[in-house]
Structures are given as structure tokens and as C-alpha cells.
């Protein structure tokens, strides 16, 4: 029991919240309620400013994202920030792009909170592969084309050895592949998928800044997508989708079509 009741303040709760892929309307009602109520919001660079604008006046907003090419915040510091804010009795929202448990290091942050005995909740978000697929008109499964979906990262923890990730095996899966953080290594990834047996004419798409005003999509084949998308100026943040379902984008690409027909504002 604290010896001085005047100093006592209950520890706050940390909410690990998915902000979705970009379009603020893809935020869940629960995420919106928590963002509005938070005393402190600790956010990444992929969180849209329109979502941060929902924070209440006076809420503390703390950026912990990594700027491209620069190193901002070691994971241990981010975890330390969450613990400190909670111990100050604050309601903390840790806002992450997409879903906190899909390549978002939400697991590590939840582990740190659990180890420190801080109360936490996880609020799922629309992960960017789902946002990219829907807005590009690529059904990730389809009774005629694909019965399985895999989420993969093209950029592993540098501490892991190369052999721990066998792209050749994924080339044999006959599944839709959704590759996060794949742009830098796309040439080698697509080469290794083909070495595993994936036909070079399998359709592939790169979707950059999916669901946002800057959304761009590029469709090619596994054989040519790396070079062709680079030549077309595509880069991170982008999702690469590989599989026969990508063919449907030529019929179902509603988002680009609607934008093309929209009157200039
Ligand atoms: N937790 C996030 C993923 C974070 S890793 C999620 O669930 O989506 C960061 C990677 O996510 C980026 O390199 C990119 O591959 C992908 N990404 C995030 N937002 C994106 C967007 N709007 N469009 C395309 N890819 C996106």
C-alpha cells in the first residue's frame, strides 16, 4: 500500500489499437472511441493525420515512427514510453497502422506490458493487405482461383539468417501471397518464388499507399513485377499480392475507376 495516499494514482491502461490501412473510415468504432478518450497517443508514421485529428484537445501525441532511412526509436524505448505513461495513470493508446498483431510488433509490446503488470487491451484493425486487396478489386480467396492466403514479410529481422525463410517453398503453395515490406527485396523474392516452381506468368500486383488519397496500383506478372514496378516509380509503403486472383483486378478495380470518374474538386 502506498505510504502517502496523496501521491497515489492508479496505473493507467494501454490500448494497442489498429488504425487500419489509411482511409480513416476503415477505423473501428472501438478504435475511434479510444482515440477520442486517450490522455496520450503513441503513434507510428503510417497512422493517418486524419485519425490523429480525432484526439481530444490537450491529449499528448507522441511520434515513435521510423522515418525512411533514419532510425528513430528503438523498440525498447517505445515500450519504456508506454510503461511510463501508464504508470503516470494515463489512458494510453498505442496506435499502429493496420493491425497491431500483423507485422506490427504488437506482440512484443503486449509482452512488455504483461511482464510489467500493466493492464492492456488489443483492438484489431484492418490490416493493409486486406485494405489493399479490397480497394484494388482482388478477392484474396475465390472458389475458382485460390483457397488459401498467406501473409509474409519481405523484410525480416536482420538477426535471422537468410535460410530461415524459404521463399521457394511459398512458390509451391498454390495460395494467394500477400507480401508486406517487400519492395526492397522484390527482385530476389520473385526470383526465389519462381525457383520454387511458381509460373513466371502468375499475375502479381503492387499496391502503394492503399486506401489513401495517394493509392496507386500496378499489375504485372511474377516474372516482371519487380523491374516494371520499380520503373513505374513504386515504393514503400506497398503490399505485393501474388496469385491467380490478381487477374480479377482488371474487372473489379472499383477504387481507381471511381477516382478516374470523380469530378475534379
Ligand atoms: N501492422 C501493419 C503492417 C506494418 S509493417 C498492418 O497490419 O498493415 C509496414 C508495411 O505494411 C509496409 O511496408 C507495407 O508493406 C504495409 N503497409 C502499411 N500500410 C500500407 C498501405 N496503406 N498500403 C500498402 N501497404 C501498406
Segment roles from a protein language model:
Residues 1-24, 29-126, 226:
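Class I S-adenosyl-L-methionine
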Residues 2-5, 11-14, 88-92, 148, ...:
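A contiguous loop/helix-start segment that scaffolds small-molecule binding in enzyme catalytic cores
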Residues 3-4, 97-173, 216-219:
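Class I SAM-dependent methyltransferase SAM-binding "motif I" and its flanking Rossmann-like core
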Residues 26, 30, 36, 46, ...:
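Conserved active-site and cofactor/substrate-binding residues in soluble primary-metabolism enzymes
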Residues 51-52, 113, 132-133, 189, ...:
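Hydrophobic packing residues within well-ordered alpha-helices of enzyme cores
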Residues 55, 136, 193, 197:
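Active-site catalytic pocket residues across diverse enzymes, especially alpha/beta-hydrolases
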Residues 59-66, 117-121, 140-150, 197-206:
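Short hydrophobic/aromatic-enriched beta-strand-loop microsegments
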